[in-house]
Every structure is written in structure tokens, then in C-alpha cells.
Amino acid sequence: MPNNALLQIKQDTLNLIDDLKVICTSFGLGNDGNEYKIITQCFLYKFLCDKFEFFFEEEFPDRTIRDYKDFKKEEKDIFFSILYDKRLPKLAYDDLLSYLFEKHFNDNDLHLQLDAIFNRISNNNATLFNTTSTDKTTIALFESVSQYINEESKRANFTRVLLDKLKNFNFKQAFSSLQNQQGYDFFAPIFEYLLKDYNNAGGGKYAEYYTPLSIASIIAKLLINEPTQSVKIYDPSAGTGTLLMALAHQIGTDSCTLYAQDISQKSLRMLKLNLILNDLTHSLKNAIEGNTLTNPYHSKNYKGKMDYIVSNPPFKLDFSNEHAEISQNKNDFFLGVPNIPKNDKSKMPVYTLFFQHCLNMLNNKGKGAIVAPTGFISAKSGIENKIVRHLVDERLVYGVICMPSQVFANTGTNVSIIFFKKTPSTNEVVLIDASKLGEEYTENKNKKTRLRESDIDLILETFQNKTQKANFSALVSFDEIREKNYSLNPGQYFIIEDTSEKISQAEFENLMQQYSSEFTSLFDESQSLQQEILETLGNLNYD
């Protein structure tokens, strides 16, 4: 399929998301806490139905989906085994959206029919789709949606309007065009668009941070610079999974297993959708809901075993209630735990704990990247300074990129990306000041910054080739960093260039004569103007 056709499908998908949001608003659910549940579940339901039908038509090119309802048990069992091998769900004919339109679209209990379908799909595919929390609570893929409309009389019509929008859209065209390429490039911007109204955390809430695709892509490309097979990748503050998806795409979805944890129920729901859209259903069981700092689920089996770790943790958070418990864990937080401040507890630098956790989880050949406030890289005190000193003294850090302000949607804080390893293997550190790159734009009356393709290429080329560029990048030794009081700020190492020009004695005298002549002319003009003004004032009369 030509690119312009694929672009049209992408635009149609974005329009579908907008339509679903408009419907929710018209039924009183605009900006409601449950709106995202309805939209993500309906979007996922349509995706799974279309994927099921697409695969059915590939397996049985001489039959239509209507023939599926007459399949005997033996035929279904064989078909289901093929589906399971491909990590696709088992759906009965009466689970499909087409069946709802065929049999129940005008029913007064249509909402109950959809709820029942969601429950059946979840139960019949529990092994494939269920996830868990740190306390072993099972979290199903779907839940009933009609409950979110308070007025029972509106539930059937609300469901009817939603399904009507779903019916008029078809993912199958996208599947056919993406057969020979990964779907990440198609679905990533769609997922980003889906998220934009549900990720307004204001920079302060736990696990609601969203990493822009451009930043996620830079991190993935700088971490993975050679073919990689059978690796474990981990994000302890996974959010909606943007960093993990970019890394998995760079590695290859069949060559990696994802591990994730996040405390936010909303983020985990979005993360599961992201995994399914990106053919990473095999890693769903590793997406855990829970507090990474007090109950790091994956530490039990994979501490010191992760090949790659990425993280964009919350920067500041009040964790005073968990402070005592966290402080007892001297192994995970070996460099210490920030003190509880007397005044504003919401400013506790929680990211320092995630950083230490990441260092613990890497294997000996592992590499990682974490997003942190730019102030961290030149911290002179506190746990921040202890971490920087550890990274430098142990020669673990190998790169820092200072990003432009306002490049992250939910925080005005200047941020940097720190690249690190588990085992010392480098003698120099690449420091890049990309803070002046990008272009400004306005979204919802807020000024933001985005990186252009040329900006991304410049960052990648400079980092990978360890190129030194005036006022942009520096390649420094660990001894130099110690001499600069452990600062990882690129600007500390830029050489101020002497831009003055050398001139001869004769040229100097000529310039002085020229300047003298110009000033004399200006003074003469000034005196003439002064005389003219005085004469004019003298000629003024009182009438």
C-alpha cells in the first residue's frame, strides 16, 4: 500500500479517537476519570476484532467471517491453537463486533451485551492477557463499561453510538500494509495522540510522566548500536511504556522480553494497550502494578540480570509515609535515601531512588538511560551528589545530554538524559548541550519545544562519533570531571574561543583615524543641531 494511503488510515484512526471523545463528552463523561477507560477499551476491542478477522481471512481465504459461526469444535480448536502461537485472542463468533450489529444493535440491553462480551474475552484469554499486581491481584484485560454512565436509560444508546463509530472504521487495511514492517512507526504516534488528553499531571504526580517519541527514539538508538538477541529490558517507572516500546522496536520485538512496573492503574491500562498494539503480548505478564520502591516485583527473580534499563521517573514526590520502610532497604538504596524536609514534602527527590534501583537491576554487561532534572548533573550535596560521585568514581557514566526546556509535556523543569553502565568500560564521557536545539510551538495555549529531525540527527551523530563541537559537545576524562568538582554539565568544559582578529600597527592607526573622523563629524553635526534648536526656541513668542 502506498505511503499516502497509510497516512490516510492513520488520519482516520486519529479521527476515530476524536469521535469517541466527542461521544463521551456529549454523554457527560468529558474529562471524567472514567473516560479514558471507555475509549481505550473500545479502541482495543475494535483492534482485536479486526485483527482476528484479518487473520481468519488469511488462514481461510475461501471463506468469510460469517462462515466462522458454523465451525465445528475440532475446527475451532485447531484454529485457536494457531491463534495462541501467534499470541492472538480466542474469540467466539458472538464476541465479534460484526455479530453485535447483526443481532443486538437495536436491543434495549445492548450495553449489557457489550459488557458480557468484554467479560467473556477476558475470561477466555486470561492466560494471554491477565496481569497482576504486587499483592497478586489479577487484573483482567477488559471490564464492564456501562457502569460509567450513571443514568441507566442512557446506557444502551451510549453504547450504540460508540459501536456505530467503531463499525465505520477498519484496522484491517493497516494490517495488510504493515505485514512486512513493524507497526511501531504506525501505532506510536497514534498512541501518543490517544494519550494527550489523559496525561495532564502537571509534573507532580507519580508515574504520570510521558516521554515524547523523539526523546524515546534518541535513547533507544544510543543504547542499541548493534544487533541484539534474547535480551531483557526493564523500566521500573514504566508509565504508558513509551521508552520500552522504542527500545523494543530498536531491538526487534521477537528479540526481547519486556519487564515493567508502575503504581498507576491508569498508566498500566495504557501500557497494556501499548504492548498489544506493538505485538508485545508475550510480555504482558511482566507488566506489574505496584510501588517499585517498596515492593520491586522483578527484583525477586531478575536483580542484576537486566540487559537494558530505561526510566523517566517522577522527579519530586512526597514519599514520607514510605520513608521508614524504604530507608531500611540498604541493599537497593546503597547510596542513601533523601531526608524528609521540614516544609514542602512534595519536593522530595524520588528519582534518586529509581536511579539506584536501576543500577542494582543491571547485569554486568548491562546499559541504561534515565531522565533526570538537569540540576542533578551538577549537584553539590545530598543523595544527588553521592550518585554523581559514584557514577564518576566507578566510571559508570558514559554520556549526558541536556535537553531543551519545555520538551517534556508535563514538566517545565529542564531535563537531561544520563547514560550509564554496570561495569566500568569507558575512559571518557560524552557531554552534549542540546538545550538550544528544537523549535517552539503552542499547544493548548502552552509554549512547548519539539526536536526537529535535523536536531535528532545532530545529537545522534555527535554522541555516537564522540565528536567535540564548540559550545555543543565535549569529550572529557574522569580526571577532568573530578577537577571540576564532579560536574557533568557540558558547559563547564566548553572552550571559550577568542574571536578577536589580529591586525597590524598600520591597520590599527588607520582604524583609529577613521573612528576619530567619524566622531568629529558626529560632534560637528551635534553642535549644528544644538544651535538650530536654540535658535528655534529663541523665535518662539507668547500669543
Segments predicted by a language model, with ranges:
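Amphipathic, well-packed alpha-helical segments that form the structural scaffold of globular domains
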Residues: 18-21, 167, 191-199, 220-224, ...
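Conserved S-adenosyl-L-methionine
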Residues: 205-311, 316-328, 372-375, 385-388, ...
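Long recognition/docking surfaces used for binding and targeting
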Residues: 50-199
